[in-house]
Amino acid sequence: MTLRVLGVDPGLTRCGIGVVDVERNRRATMVAVGVVGTSPDESLDQRLLVIATAIDEWLDRYEPQVLAVERVFSQLNVSTVMGVAQASGVVIAAAARRGIPVALHTPSEVKAAVTGSGSSNKDAVTKLVTKILRLDAPPRPADAADALALAITHAWRAGSGASVATTGPGSSSLTPAQRAWAEAEAKARRAR
């Protein structure tokens, strides 16, 4: 069974959106990726409307089973946090109207799931997203790569109900993060 996840890296100026199909063996394939941009010159209500309209279109077009949204975290710039929170609210409401579950993931969770380290930088995340999805070129801008990383993270952490890679923890077809995750899950199963 394939799980379709729509990942959203919320932002008021740039909102990354990515759709990924993930198989039970954790093989992930990009379906679509994009960024919804709004101008700071526009009023807040119009900016949120642009994001809401785009999210509605993506939900209708790609019919994801779940949304993975980056959890808002505290930053020094309050206006940035507010914009991210407002964009997140629009996205979550769009999913709720359709009865689509929403999962929130912290940036550290996403980095750890994709790269194996919760303190990785954006370049490392983009590089591994490109490898995991077998893309010819890295998704740009970083908001697009982050949206795909969110979708991958959700599917690998909670989504598919699968027991990790059928190719086994030592497989060379897995990234270091996938191998570490597979080994941890295998160890947890043995401990039961």
Curated annotation (Swiss-Prot):
Transmembrane segments: none annotated. Residues 161-192 are annotated as: Disordered. Pfam families: RuvC. InterPro entries: RNaseH-like_sf (IPR012337), RNaseH_sf (IPR036397), X-over_junc_endoDNase_RuvC (IPR002176). Residues 182-192 have a biased composition (Basic and acidic residues). The keyword Amino-acid biosynthesis does not apply. It comes from the Bacteria. Residues 163-176 have a biased composition (Polar residues). Signal peptide: none annotated. The keyword Electron transport does not apply. One of its GO terms (molecular function) is DNA binding. One of its GO terms (biological process) is DNA recombination. It is found in: Cytoplasm. Its cofactor is Mg(2+). Its main location: cytoplasm. The active site is at residues 9, 70, 143. It catalyses: Endonucleolytic cleavage at a junction such as a reciprocal single-stranded crossover between two homologous DNA duplexes (Holliday junction). The RuvA-RuvB-RuvC complex processes Holliday junction (HJ) DNA during genetic recombination and DNA repair. Endonuclease that resolves HJ intermediates. Cleaves cruciform DNA by making single-stranded nicks across the HJ at symmetrical positions within the homologous arms, yielding a 5'-phosphate and a 3'-hydroxyl group; requires a central core of homology in the junction. The consensus cleavage sequence is 5'-(A/T)TT(C/G)-3'. Cleavage occurs on the 3'-side of the TT dinucleotide at the point of strand exchange. HAMAP family: RuvC. Belongs to the RuvC family. Homodimer which binds Holliday junction (HJ) DNA. The HJ becomes 2-fold symmetrical on binding to RuvC with unstacked arms; it has a different conformation from HJ DNA in complex with RuvA. In the full resolvosome a probable DNA-RuvA(4)-RuvB(12)-RuvC(2) complex forms which resolves the HJ. NCBIfam families: ruvC. This is Crossover junction endodeoxyribonuclease RuvC. The gene is ruvC.
